[in-house]
Amino acid sequence: MNAELDALKGALDRQREHVLGILEGLSEEDLRRPVLPSGWSCLALLRHLTLDVERFWFPGVIAGEPDMAGQLTAGTEAHWYVPEDMSAEEVFADYRAAIARADAVLAAAAPEQDPAAWPVEIWPTWRLPDVRHILIHVLTEVACHSGHLDAVRELIDGTTWLGGNPYAGQALGAVTA
């Protein structure tokens, strides 16, 4: 990678840590329970981040791996569903594995590199031009969803995500009120 992608990936890594950190300590029941009227659960949002964000944008769009973009066109609603026989541990493991694969794709990428694939069947008139823009898009989406998880976690048990300055290397963590 280069300095620009390193900086963007560093910010993305902090948001990924936020997602995992705010969910730490929740029971399987709380992870599966919808809290907001829209009906998604914390595990469903984590599955969305795994399939529709980490796997789709990095291996699918940037690297052009087959079936990644096809997974999104198959129906994103299914990606917000966690089967009863899929444990929370499996959902978390899938997310971590998707991050590792995404990081490997990014390590081989350049900011100005064109995407290897684009799902024109989903977005025929919209396109992100390069890896830089894709990474910014993903960073924005993960940050938005980490905020959603913050609100839900606070509603569940009063825990909020607090921490020092992430740019100063201070540890971040969840704090129960």
PLM features: what roles do these ranges have?
Residues 1-2:
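Short, contiguous pre-domain boundary segments
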Residues 5, 9-24, 28-78, 119-177:
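Short, contiguous alpha-helical
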Residues 78-119, 130-143:
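Acidic/histidine-rich alpha-helical segments that form the ligand environment
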